[in-house]
Amino acid sequence: VRRFEHLTVVTNSIQNALVLSERPEFTVILIGGILDKKELSLGNDFSQMLESLHLDILFMSVSGVHPSVGLTDQGPSEARVQKQMCQIADRTVVLADSSKFGRASLVKLCALCDVDQIITDGGLDTDMEQKIKDTGVTLDVVRNGER
């Protein structure tokens, strides 16, 4: 995020909005809805607002990354937002630490081949890494000390 001089960010995460609001050159669009106190995010039916937007790149996190099930998340409300944002984005990048791999949560978001890139840490075993790559998605593993 530091390399961008001007950036418009669309989020339903209050925490992300607060962090990004510290950058005066960024525009933050916080999508409204019902507050999920546990996740500190807003969820509800705000699909009309999302339908009017275009996203160049969507960065999203998930609860599970499974080679055959795909990308999953715990909350139906959050999953609905993620699915719609994937549809309006030119490019989707998933950020998931290695503990999320091989897991499938409650709500299926999409197949792995439906996203452009997955970025994870160096804790992924080589067998799982190969299974993910076999789905056709670009997998980038960031090892300790790499940027």
Task: Identify the residue ranges that each predicted region occupies.
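Conserved phosphate- and dinucleotide-binding cores of soluble alpha/beta proteins
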Residues: 8, 15-147
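Glycine-rich beta-alpha loop segments
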Residues: 1-5, 10
